[in-house]
Structure formats: structure tokens, C-alpha cells
């Protein structure tokens, strides 16, 4: 299949080693961040925050978060261009949704008169409340929707990436306490350009299950 979307997805892969001399341009970074902002979410809740690790000081903090576990991902932090933390809200309140609906009014998606009726969608949030009054089991998957959007955007931009679930959420919440207040982070994304001779994964063929093994058409 020659469609450009398929070309993007056939060529993207998980980078295993980065070239520290190459940085993502501010123009391309702006495209990625706007794509993240435009990502889909349940009831348009947008229960997330995307924290961009760019400076050397921020990278050192991120590097230090691997002190206790998942050290195999630690080398990416200083070698890649940027790291993005995909953070999801622990609790999602009516006030949070009011911000979303007020923006929808400002954007002329709904009228002020329709706003209260639109709050009916918040019932879905209440159905996903745990015994501690938190909604993280529901907000966490929303962050992964944004992650998928980011991966395809990066493929289109010819920027390499490494999805990292091998992080330490507890230590991250301590090191980035101010930035993650009210949020948790279970996945991060390293972005940049792979090392031309030391990224073994760059030259390996793509391997996915056969179409008929994963697609059922009724």
C-alpha cells in the first residue's frame, strides 16, 4: 500500500540510541505540541498536561528519576533532543469540565445557554470515579490517546521517538512535584534523531501480526 499514512507507520520505529548532536527544531517542536493540544479525549475532557523536558537542568532532573528502576531508559534522557511527560489528572472535577465548556463557548462551539445542558456529559466522569474519589483509571487512557497522536505526528516529521513506560511514577512525582501537582505520569516520550551507526533497531524490518489476525469485519 502506497498511501502516505501507511508510509509513515511502516517507517516509524522505537529508537534505541540517539545522536546527541542533533536537536529537533523549534518549528517542528511547535507542530508536535500543537498536535498534542489538538488530541482527542473522552467527552473532550482533556485531562492532561504535557511537560516538555528541554533544558540541561530539566534533563538532569529527569535523569535522576531513574535512580531506583528502569535504568535501561536512562541513557535516552541526555542523548535525545527532548523528553515529554504525559501527565493525567488524578481527579477530574466539575470545575475542570467547566473550563472545557467555557472554552467551547468562547470558541463558539456551543452557546452560553447550551453550557448547562452540556454538563450532562459529566455523568460519564462520575461513573468512572474510584473508591478514593479519583478518576485516574479513566484519565490515564486519555493520555495514551495523545501519545498515539504524537507518534504519528513525529513519523510525519521524520523525527525519531522512544515511548517509555519504564519510568518511576513515584520518584517522578517527587522530583517534578510542582509541575505534577494534582497529576501523575506513567509514560514519557523521548524524541530526537537516532544514532546513525549505533541504533540497531533502525535497520531491522517492520514486524506486525497479519491483517487477518487482528482485523475482523462483520
Curated annotation (Swiss-Prot):
Gene3D superfamilies: NADH Oxidase
Cofactor or coenzyme needed: FMN
One Gene Ontology MF term: oxidoreductase activity
Quaternary data: Homodimer.
Pfam families noted in UniProt: Nitroreductase (PF00881)
Family: Belongs to the nitroreductase family.
Domain of life: Bacteria
Sequence positions that bind FMN: 12-16, 73, 165-166, 206-208
Residue positions binding NAD(+): 154-159
EC number: 1.6.99.-
Function: Involved in bioluminescence. It is a good supplier of reduced flavin mononucleotide (FMNH2) to the bioluminescence reaction. Major FMN reductase. It is capable of using both NADH and NADPH as electron donors. As electron acceptor, FMN is the most effective, FAD is considerably effective, and riboflavin is the least effective.
GO biological process, any: bioluminescence
Keywords: FAD, Flavoprotein, FMN, Luminescence, NAD, NADP, Oxidoreductase
Protein name: Major NAD(P)H-flavin oxidoreductase
